[in-house]
């Protein structure tokens, strides 16, 4: 069985009236160890034939077999495996990647074989040393002469073994001395057992081969052998490995090339990132503002008590009948306090009136409350003491004042122990409350607190309360507790002549409302992310066009479609992730400035918003980078190589 068998190979370019028949019923066979020169003038079809033999192109019709296996039935990745594992290409224009060193160019085919980094470097250095380039391992192609570049190309062809060497005009771009040196190397490869297929238009170069096939106008006109072929020897090559290092090395190579591509066009990359930066910064900042405002509001709610339910007479706030409803009593509060899910219950009654101290008269509000009220409402004592259970039981004529009362009446003296008059009733000051920065309502109101028994018995003369504040136990569900209290009071009153205000319900409403606002504003900010994503897609399409030749080179040395897809996808994701991180940093800087000048509520950047931003930018990179990457992966190797 011949190594290569072609039967009736035809190749057409163009269509319709412009269709050109390039190869016409080409049939030939090549044995292992042959050195074949395909000669012909420009346009004869010799390069097209070599491209088909090297699986860079496909025939329009006919059969092409390697070791008896029909290539026409192979998938793109199977053809890539042939190029990677058995073929080595020597191009007229060298086709080295300009961004890589000589060592890296030579080692590149082994990346797609899954060879480890040390193994790749050692083999590449050995090949370069054998070809007289030991001192040029770290040089880039632009730092090498034409002959040196071609020797690097030869070393690359041998990296994975190069059982079959395809040489396309290997001396065409070289001076006479360099061309002679390259042909000597090719002779040595043949003598070492490599099958060599060389394309040339020069009869002198073709004379080096032991078999010459001449093509004219797409047809073989002669096939002569002047020397018997050398018996083939086994050509050693790197074996493909299926291990974690296989995928790791390919990822590292793809990532490195992506970084180089981004850095090669710094300004373009920055402008591409700009849409992502603005979008991510907007989203993170909006979420931070939402978190800060929500946190501030919830702190304000906490200032009036957490896990609390307030019970009022009437059907709701603003009910004109509520003042005539007098069924909410101290007994209700006592019964409520005995429920298993209740931590405490304190009634509250209030009265407005004139507050007098010495010759000063002020309008103030006096609240009659229980001893637990201050703890339930989260009020803090600045000085003195709070009234206790005994004070409540004994109708003690004591009062706790707020900071406003202290400032108005006792600006220059200690209020503790002083007696003030409220509606002409004497009350002894026993404590002063701290100013409540988070309190709702008018902060200028003068407020006093006394035992509810004192207020009801000595000031208002009423037996009902204005409200009852209930503290629910931490392990109890406030919604269930609210229903239980409703059922209890309905049973006691015979009707539902009261309504409740659940602090947790307010919290839920605030969280829901701020969440909706954050979502709405974030949706608007996401538009800039979409615009940024379109910019990434556009620039990646440009990158694919600019690097089409590079894609062709990688495919020629064995890159799978998945390798090409991975490389360009990583590049898109890299741009977006960097943009996302810069956007997060920008948002953090904005929050620092904002928090310095605005003290009412902070911008609160959460870890989840940062993680979400990075995940979002990664998702955009994948979503908008896939189409350009997929376009690159589906390029035909020979079409890609033909691009300048």
Swiss-Prot record:
It is a multi-pass membrane protein. PANTHER family: MACROLIDE EXPORT ATP-BINDING_PERMEASE PROTEIN MACB, MEMBRANE COMPONENT OF TRANSPORTER-RELATED. Homodimer. Belongs to the ABC transporter superfamily. Macrolide exporter (TC 3.A.1.122) family. This is Macrolide export ATP-binding/permease protein MacB. Its EC number is 7.6.2.-. InterPro entries: AAA+_ATPase, ABC3_permease_C, ABC_transporter-like_ATP-bd, ABC_transporter-like_CS, MacB-like_ATP-bd, MacB_PCD, Macrolide_Exporter_MacB, P-loop_NTPase. Non-canonical ABC transporter that contains transmembrane domains (TMD), which form a pore in the inner membrane, and an ATP-binding domain (NBD), which is responsible for energy generation. Confers resistance against macrolides. The chain crosses the membrane at residues 270-290, 524-544, 574-594, 607-627. The gene is macB.
């Amino acid at each position: 069985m011949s190594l290569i068998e072609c039967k009736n190979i035809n190749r057409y370019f163009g269509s319709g009236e412009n269709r050109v028949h390039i190869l016409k019923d080409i049939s030939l066979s090549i044995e292992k160890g042959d050195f074949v020169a395909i000669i012909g003038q420009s346009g004869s079809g010799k390069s097209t034939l070599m491209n088909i033999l090297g699986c860079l192109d496909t025939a329009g019709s006919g059969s092409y077999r390697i070791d008896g296996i029909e290539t026409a039935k192979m998938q793109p990745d199977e053809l890539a495996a042939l190029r990677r594992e058995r073929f080595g290409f020597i191009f007229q224009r060298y086709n080295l990647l300009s961004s890589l060193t000589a060592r890296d160019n030579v080692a590149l085919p082994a990346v797609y074989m899954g060879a480890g980094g040390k193994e790749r470097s050692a083999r590449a250095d050995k090949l370069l040393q054998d070809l007289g380039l030991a001192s040029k391992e770290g040089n880039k192609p632009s730092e090498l002469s034409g002959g040196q570049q071609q020797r690097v190309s030869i070393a690359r062809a041998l990296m994975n073994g190069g059982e079959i060497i395809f040489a396309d005009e290997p001396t065409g771009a070289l001076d006479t001395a360099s061309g002679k040196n390259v042909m000597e190397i090719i002779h040595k490869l043949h003598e070492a057992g490599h099958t060599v297929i060389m394309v040339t238009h020069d009869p002198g170069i073709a004379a080096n081969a032991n078999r010459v096939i001449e093509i004219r106008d797409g047809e073989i006109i002669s096939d002569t052998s002047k020397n018997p072929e050398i018996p083939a020897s086994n050509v050693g090559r790197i074996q493909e490995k299926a291990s974690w290092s296989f995928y790791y090395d390919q990822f590292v190579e793809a990532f490195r090339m992506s970084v180089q591509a981004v850095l090669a066009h710094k300004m373009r990359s920055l402008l591409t990132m700009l849409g992502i930066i603005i979008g991510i910064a907007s989203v993170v900042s909006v979420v931070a503002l939402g978190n800060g405002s929500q946190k501030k509001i919830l702190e304000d709610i906490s200032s009036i008590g957490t896990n609390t339910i307030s019970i009022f007479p009437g059907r709701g706030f603003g009910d004109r009948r509520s003042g005539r409803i007098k069924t909410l009593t101290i007994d209700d509060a006592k019964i409520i306090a005995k429920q298993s899910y209740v931590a405490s219950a304190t009634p509250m009654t209030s009265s407005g009136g004139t507050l007098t101290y010495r010759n000063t008269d002020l309008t103030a509000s006096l609240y009659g409350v229980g001893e637990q009220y201050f703890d339930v409402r989260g009020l803090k004592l600045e000085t003195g003491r709070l009234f206790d259970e005994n004070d409540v039981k004994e109708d003690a004529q004591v009062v706790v004042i707020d900071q406003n009362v202290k400032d108005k009446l006792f600006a220059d003296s200690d209020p503790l122990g002083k007696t003030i008059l409220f509606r002409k009733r004497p009350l002894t000051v026993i404590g002063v409350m701290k100013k409540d920065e988070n309190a709702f309502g008018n902060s200028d109101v003068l407020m006093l607190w006394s035992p509810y028994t004192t207020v009801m018995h000595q000031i208002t003369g009423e037996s009902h309360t204005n409200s009852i504040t209930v503290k629910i136990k931490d392990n109890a569900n406030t919604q269930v507790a609210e229903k239980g209290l409703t059922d209890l009071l309905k049973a006691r009153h015979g009707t539902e002549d009261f309504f409740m205000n659940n602090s947790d319900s307010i919290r839920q409403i605030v969280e829901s409302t701020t969440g909706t606002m954050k979502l709405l504003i974030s949706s608007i900010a996401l538009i800039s992310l979409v615009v940024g994503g379109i910019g990434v897609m556009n620039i990646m399409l440009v990158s694919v066009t600019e690097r089409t030749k590079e894609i062709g080179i990688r495919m020629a040395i064995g890159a799978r479609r998945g390798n090409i897809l991975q490389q360009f996808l990583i590049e898109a994701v890299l741009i977006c992730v960097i943009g996302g991180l810069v956007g997060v940093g920008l948002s953090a800087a904005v929050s620092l400035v904002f928090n310095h000048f605005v003290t009412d509520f902070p911008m609160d950047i959460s870890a989840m918003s940062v993680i979400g931003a990075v995940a979002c930018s990664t998702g955009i990179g994948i979503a908008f980078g896939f189409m350009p990457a997929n376009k690159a992966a589906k390029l035909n190797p020979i079409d890609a190589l033909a691009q300048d």
